[in-house]
Amino acid sequence: MKLITILLLCSRLLPSLAQEEGAQEMDCNDETVFQAVDTALKKYNAELESGNQFLLYRVTEGTKKDGAETLYSFKYQIKEGNCSVQSGLTWQDCDFKDAEEAATGECTTTLGKKENKFSVATQICNITPGKGPKKTEEDLCVGCFQPIPMDSSDLKPVLKHAVEHFNNNTKHTHLFALTEVKSAHSQVVAGMNYKIIYSIVQTNCSKEDFPFLREDCVPLPYGDHGECRGHTYVDIHNTIAGFSQSCDLYPGDDLFSLLPKKCFGCPKNIPVDSPELKEALGHSIAQLNAQHNHLFYFKIDTVKKATSQVVAGTKYVIEFIARETNCSKQTNTELTADCETKHLGQSLNCNANVYMRPWENKVVPTVRCQALDMMISRPPGFSPFRLVQVQETKEGTTRLLNSCEYKGRLSKAGAGPAPDHQAEASTVTP
């Protein structure tokens, strides 16, 4: 049986989405409704790894908003069909599965339209499983890809590697963070194959200021978005030995509203000579001298970079160079202004995090340092401290939101590791 537009049985128009300024309700007899929902449903079926395709049952809500790009929003209901996702058929060529055994669902989607072509911007489908017969061991395909929980601990190192690979191999100015795991499958081979689909979002951490993703990097709600499909092979030594992925990245300048000029709650660069840093630096050097077992005190020689972030208080992140002084801990109870740095003393490159809540008199400093061995062989008269430059960032940049569209193709299950690309080996540590 071929499903045609008669399936577009509208139970109600859009009372909620129509409240959006400029949004117009759509009539169920509008052919555009079918074309848009057909695009969205085909995309959803194309992303399924196993099982049967879903068929359109009813469109329940629909609006459009005109602009530089016309935006369409729909809610529609779907039911499981009798055609597998590998059949090569479209959903219109399938029949509904028996009602009692069929899974059902409801999808919410937003699409854009340019040059008479629809593209899915966002889509969320909630599926209710049917009451089909339970699978036995004989029904399971040994050696085939099987779905696994998307919050499985086995996926943590795989996802971490995937996001790091994306950040290290793209020319984007900012780091991206994981937002959602959309699909996860594993296959037992001589080791383990993983297939994952996940979404990413731009954070406020630029690659210029942050060499790697940190916990305080904040996802930007109006930043660039992307969706990735990855294949990972973990060998019998629990090492990621094979990895490939493809990502579709979409700029945040096509849909929805402007990003505020100021990102409240995001880390901001502050001048290295700012008086605001005085107290935080004092706590940092005190913590360094308290935890360092060197016979002499250290003092801060150069502040290289500093940021502050408003949280429940203020968090300072400071990079500085500390140098050994002539004040020994045996004869001095604390570091004083009279302590001078030794010309050939030891130097440390330090990173400090200082969390301050003044109204509670609470200060929590953490400092990590590494010796600057390069200082031993510096030429006479040369001081790397004089070469430190303050980097300024431009404010006022605005970005627009555009949710991602995934255009990936199904991958065939294989018995070995994904052959596309070999990533650098990295040990899997949950």
Swiss-Prot record:
Keyword set includes Methyltransferase: no
Induction remarks: In response to an inflammatory stimulant. T-kininogen II synthesis is induced and the plasma concentration of T-kininogen I is raised.
Bridged cysteine pairs (disulfide): C28-C404, C83-C94, C107-C125, C141-C144, C205-C217, C228-C247, C263-C266, C327-C339, C350-C369
Subcellular location field: Secreted, Extracellular space
One Pfam entry name: Cystatin
GO biological process: acute-phase response; negative regulation of blood coagulation; negative regulation of cell adhesion; vasodilation
UniProt KW keywords: Acute phase, Disulfide bond, Glycoprotein, Protease inhibitor, Pyrrolidone carboxylic acid, Repeat, Secreted, Signal, Thiol protease inhibitor, Vasoactive, Vasodilator
GO terms, molecular function: cysteine-type endopeptidase inhibitor activity
Alphabetized PROSITE patterns for the sequence: CYSTATIN (PS00287), CYSTATIN_KININOGEN (PS51647)
InterPro entries: Cystatin_dom (IPR000010), Cystatin_sf (IPR046350), Kininogen-type_cystatin_dom (IPR027358), Kininogen_Fetuin_HRG (IPR050735), Prot_inh_cystat_CS (IPR018073)
Glycan attachment residues as annotated in the record: N82, N168, N204, N326
Post-translational modification: As T-kinin is preceded by a Met instead of an Arg or Lys, it is not released from its precursor by either tissue or plasma kallikrein.
Tissue: Plasma.
Segments of this protein annotated with the region Disordered: 410-430
One GO cellular component, as annotated: extracellular region
Modified residues (Pyrrolidone carboxylic acid): Q19
Signal peptide: 1-18
Function recorded in the entry: Kininogens are plasma glycoproteins with a number of functions: (1) as precursor of the active peptide bradykinin they effect smooth muscle contraction, induction of hypotension and increase of vascular permeability. (2) They play a role in blood coagulation by helping to position optimally prekallikrein and factor XI next to factor XII. (3) They are inhibitor of thiol proteases.
Entry protein name: T-kininogen 2
Natural source organism: Rattus norvegicus (Rat)
